[in-house]
Design a protein with these regions (language model features):
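Conserved cytosolic headpiece of P-type ATPases
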Residues: 1-229
Length: 229
């Protein structure tokens, strides 16, 4: 019974937190910054496109964004920086590899004017395993193993600020992939950057945890996020 409990395990998102994501920080152009101070060059534009297109949420006629809280936060982030919702219409999805909790990745293929781009988002470690290059201030560089430590350091900094971090990558292809080619879609990617999102705690969560502590009950939080988050 509850009265004889010694340990209580709780999931985090939506139970201890409000499940209302907001993008707070961005790692792009070799640095982490608040979104208001981010350097908005071509690298940043690619990150925004990845946020908007590798995304299953929808912008409704009344301006509201419907979908998963993480994905709606990514679209809201782009719209607040004046990137138009028309980007989602003008770059239609022609193929996809849906998000899978085991892979911790999602990929889409979007086309425009006969050109196709694979956009991928997911956990940092999973993204880095699929990449062989990275964007660095407008150029694609291939010494990813040397640069990966700097990426992980910035990921750790954001996680230590209680931010949930998603990483983004892309590659250009010259045709719509066949069913066979879809198996290797998430390979040879170029790392773009990361975003850090805050999911505010519920006001009552802190008091509930304190009551458990005073009662001698150990509390355990269950989450798929980075340990530091």
């Amino acid at each position: 019974t509850l009265g004889s409990s010694t340990v209580i395990c709780s999931d985090k998102t939506g139970t201890l937190t409000q499940n209302k994501m907001t993008v707070e920080k961005v790692f792009c152009n070799d640095t982490t910054s608040d979104i208001e101070r981010a350097e908005t060059n071509e690298d940043f534009r690619k990150l925004i496109y990845d946020c908007m297109l590798c995304n299953d949420s929808r912008v409704l006629e009344n301006g509201e964004i419907a979908g998963d809280p993480t994905e709606t936060a990514l679209v809201d982030f782009a719209l607040k920086l004046d990137y138009p919702v028309s980007i989602m219409r003008e770059n239609p999805r022609v193929a996809e590899v849906p998000f899978d909790s085991n892979r911790k990745l999602m990929s889409t293929v979007n086309g425009k004017d006969g050109k196709y781009i694979v956009y991928t988002k997911g956990g940092l470690d999973e993204i880095l395993r699929k990449c062989d290059s990275y964007l660095y201030k407008g150029s694609v560089r291939h010494n990813l193993s040397d640069y990966a430590e700097w990426i992980r350091t910035n990921n750790e900094h954001m996680a230590n600020e209680a931010l949930r971090v998603l990483a983004f990558a892309y590659k250009e292809i010259d045709h719509v992939p066949s069913k066979y080619e879809m198996e290797n879609l998430e390979s040879g990617l170029t790392f773009i950057g990361m975003v850090g999102m805050i999911d505010p705690p519920r006001e009552e969560a802190k008091k509930a945890v304190e009551k458990c502590k005073h009662a001698g009950i150990k509390t355990v939080m269950i989450t798929g996020d980075h340990k530091a988050t």
